[in-house]
C-alpha cells in the first residue's frame, strides 16, 4: 500500500479497555501488512483493573512522547477507545468514594481528559498526530464525556447508523462531521466552495427526505428534484473501497487524489453526471472509471 511504503514515522496504538480477541486479531493484521516494525502496541485489556486501564492510555502517550522528543520521530498516536479511558477513570473515582457529577461521571472528568489531550502536541523535535475512536453513548453528542473529548479535537468524523443502513461505507455523516481546517484561508477558495456546495446539496436532500417518503419525487419542484438527484449521486460517490477491507468485500481498494475528488465534485454540482446512474457512482473511486459503466 502506498501509505505503508511512504510513511517514515512511527505509530503508537493504545488499546484502552480493548477486548483480548480484538487486540490479538489486530496484532496479526499488522504483522500480515508488514507494519509491525513501525508500530508500538500498548494494551490495557478489558479484564484488567480500572486503575490499570486508566493508566495505560497515559503510558502509551509517554511512549509517543519519548519517540517524539528523544528519537525525534513523527508519531501517529491511535487510541481505541478514548471513552473507555474515561470509563476507567469513572470506576476509579467510584472506588475512591468521590461524589459523581453530571450523568454519573467523575467530578474530575474534564481534568482527566485534558491531562491526556493537552500532551498531544508538536515540538521543535517532532510531532504527535492523534486519531481517537470516541464511543458515543446512545448516539448523544451532548454526553459530558463526549463533549469533553470533542473540545480538544481539530476534526471530528462522525460515523452514522443511518448511513450504514443505506449501505454507505465508510458510514461518514458529512453534515455531522466538522473540522477547524474548514476555512477559506486554509483550504483556498476552490476547495472551500466545492465543500460548501456538496454540504448544501446533502443538507437540502436530508430536509426533503420525509417529503419524498410521503409524497414522492413528483411533488418536488424541478430545482429540488435536480438537487436530490445530484445529492444521491454525491452520497454514493463519497463511498470508498478500502484496501484493508478488500479481503472481506472482494472489492479492490482505491485511493483518489484530492485534485480528482475536487474535480469530480465540481462535475456533480454542475450536472455533468446527471446522465450517470447512481450505481455507477458507488464504490468506484474516481468518476473517470464510473462514467464508463453508467446506464
Regions found by a protein language model. Give the residues of each.
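Phosphate-binding/switch loop-helix module in NTP-utilizing enzymes
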Residues: 53-89
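Fold-independent oxyanion-binding glycine-rich loops
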Residues: 15-16, 44-46, 81, 133-134
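Nucleotide-state-sensitive switch-loop elements of NTP-binding domains
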Residues: 7-11, 18-66, 92-112
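Loop/turn-to-beta-strand initiation segments
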Residues: 8-11, 37-40, 71-76, 125-131
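Short, small-residue-biased leader/transition segments that mark boundaries at the very start
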Residues: 1-3
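Residue-level marker for buried hydrophobic side chains located in beta-strands
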Residues: 14, 77-78, 283
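Conserved catalytic/coupling modules of large nucleotide/cofactor-utilizing molecular machines
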Residues: 62, 66, 84-85, 91-295
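Residue-level signal for short amphipathic helical patches enriched in basic/charged
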Residues: 18, 33, 70, 123, ...
